[in-house]
């Protein structure tokens, strides 16, 4: 409360592996109710429609659907369904286009700019995670972020962009 800085309480896949989404939703909402600070209660990297629906139904204020391993058509289809349900409850939706890799794991594939434009225009999401050289769980001090690609995507879309990792 002292700083007034908004906070995101996030439940990623490793957290959800140990604690069910309904319990996390109640816990996060309780914590948020104990402060005047703006708190976002976020399901991060929901990989299925049902997982995101469960987050919506469990009191989260934001969900992220990670359809980055799906075809563009399937990613749009599922993201649109999630956004339709979420928006009825004033819940924001983040989608991901272009796989973001992991440190010492599968490398980032990079977001295709035209796919990003199509995804932003057709999925009805509120924010879009992109792959531009960023890496989850990065431990090195040097990142190879493609700022030119970020600028090109930003110029062609009217949606807030999100970078995971790095």
Predicted feature residues:
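Alpha/beta enzyme core
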Residues: 1-15, 21-40, 46-163
């Amino acid at each position: 409360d002292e700083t007034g800085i908004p906070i995101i309480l996030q439940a990623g896949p490793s957290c959800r592996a140990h604690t069910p989404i309904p319990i996390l939703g109640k816990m996060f909402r309780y914590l948020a109710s104990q402060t005047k600070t703006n708190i976002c209660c976020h399901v991060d990297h929901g990989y299925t429609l049902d997982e995101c629906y469960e987050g919506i139904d469990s009191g989260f204020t934001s969900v992220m659907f990670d359809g980055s391993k799906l075809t563009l058509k399937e990613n749009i289809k599922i993201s649109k369904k999630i956004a339709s349900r979420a928006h009825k409850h004033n819940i924001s939706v983040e989608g991901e286009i272009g796989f973001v890799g992991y440190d010492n794991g599968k490398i980032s594939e990079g977001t295709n700019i035209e796919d990003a434009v199509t995804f932003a225009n057709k999925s009805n999401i509120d924010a879009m995670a992109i792959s531009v050289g960023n890496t989850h769980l990065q431990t090195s001090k040097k990142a190879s972020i493609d700022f030119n690609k970020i600028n090109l995507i930003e110029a062609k879309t009217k949606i807030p962009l999100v970078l995971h990792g790095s």
